[in-house]
Amino acid sequence: MPFPWLAGQRITAERLMESAPVYIQKTALQSRTSTVTPTADPDLRITLDPGTYDIELELGYSGTAGSGGVRTSWSVDAGITAISGIRFTRGTGQDATTRNSDASRHTGNGLSTEAIYGLTTGSGQRGWGSERWRALVTAPGEIRFQWAQKTSHADGSWVAPESFLKVTRTG
């Protein structure tokens, strides 16, 4: 949805910049071991002012035969809700062993409901997942992407530096 403009409205540089997408890129490969409890990613988070936003995540990840991939969810501050209460996820399914697997996920989940992406071929091969949702922000607050291993194991699961968050204000 385009940012709302009204006939005769004065358009300023500040007003134009309000609707420009903001990109937040993961800064380095990050590994987590021996955990299935999603915790906030140190990079993939942003503080939002009141308004309506499209939130898009592109996730590069990997796992091993032991760790199996990643599980994801979101945490948000009070005053932030998902419009329609769900996020849409797509990528390799939790039973996938390679990124070329026919096992895929295309689902709607609540923000705190874990989505599981499988991949067991190690860090040399990365899987790709996408998540999208629309946020209604009534009070300033932060949204945080969270992740952990699919299966707790000493072998790590990774989120890659090509992962990014795109946030676009739509209202």
Which residues are covered by each model-predicted region?
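A glycine-anchored, Pro-Gly-centered beta-turn/N-cap motif
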Residues: D49-G51
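Glycine-rich, low-complexity segments
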Residues: M1-P38, S84, R169-G171
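Short surface loop/edge beta-strand patches of beta-sandwich-type extracellular domains
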Residues: P42-R45
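C-terminal interaction-tip segments
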Residues: D77, T138-G171
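A short beta-strand element within beta-rich, extracytoplasmic domains
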Residues: Y53-Y61, F145-W147
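Extracellular beta-rich ligand/substrate-recognition surface
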Residues: A28-A40, Y61-G63, Y117-G127
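Short loop/turn segments at connectors of secondary-structure elements within structured domains
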Residues: W5, G66-G68, A139
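Terminal beta-strand-rich extracellular "head" domains
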Residues: T64-R132, A160-P161, T168-G171
